Amino acid sequence: GGTTNRTEYLLGDFCRYGDGGTDIEPLAHLYKHQVYQIARRLGVIEEIITRTPSPDTFSLPVSDQEFFFRIPFERLDHLLYAWEHQVPTGTTAAVLGLAEDAVKRAFQDFTAKHRATAHLRSLPRGLQ
């Protein structure tokens, strides 16, 4: 099975024939913070849970968060949920204690990443 979670899936943070090259994605409906919650509930050792996720594309240590998102995952998932469910930016900003401009920028970034990576979420095309 694949390891791509909803946060990564919506924003295209996976490789189609890498971690996305699988017949089943059992985590694709869960945001990243939910995967961490389930891991703790299942008793996964903390060393594994707290290991920094990495795209493994640089020789220097860099986390997925630093490389792709620039937003802490806890906040990212709340923003992503609001974007996905079309919660107004003003409401999202008020609930999360953020400036509305910051929420608008995040939503614009999500939209751009989602559009730019749409091909990753579709089946490969045939010749006919």
Task: Name every feature range the model reports, one short phrase each.
Residues 2-128:
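ATP/NTP-dependent adenylation/nucleotidyl-transfer catalytic domains that generate, transfer
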